[in-house]
Amino acid sequence: IDEFLGKGYPMTNMDTGEPLRSIRERILSANAYLGAFPLAEALRTGAGVVVSGRCADAALALAPAIYTYGWRPEDYDLLASGMVAGHVIECGAQVTGGNSLANWRSLANLEEIGYPIVEMQPDGSFVVTKHPGSGGRVDSHGVKEQLVYEIGDPRAYYGPDCVTDFTSVRLADDGPDRVRVTRAAGAAPTDFLKLSINYSAGWKAVGTLVYTSPFAREKAQEAD
């Protein structure tokens, strides 16, 4: 960190614009969000288990596709497909009904909700599904809701391997509990990486569960 600051990089807080120097003496840890290619290289060398530092969530899904299909750093549309796939499944059961408000009354067996599976193709198209017989549901409504989860500008979702345009993506139901995802578009990544920093600033613990209208009370009672 001191080396980058010494070279003149401002390293400002992406929410407040506050310079890093203002908290430098209180920093406890710092982790850059790395991309998928080092993970794919580990797979290429025969690793059965890959232990990584902090990487982008979607890199965990993108790396196996890079390794399996030989995608290159300049294959931005393909990398964007992997980023979309990783983003869709990165929060587990959110995309199988755990975070879906569409037709929520008909979601079955949520206490045994299934976790998502991506069936990736060499051209970057993929199907989102789940294990047969597990609870929840995979449909285009749930995938759409997960697509816009924590992304900022949907036309420019920044990652270490590419910038993804989520507005280019097309969804189609592909049978029960199957959604096909196509046409992801990508562009070259920026010269920057996201840096997560923990620093000492006292402590606060807050827990919140939010249920949106309509029928917010009924949803909360159903979840109890």
Describe the predicted segments one by one.
Residues A63-Y69, Q121-K130, Y199-L209:
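Short acidic (Asp/Glu) and glycine-rich catalytic loops that position anionic groups and cofactors
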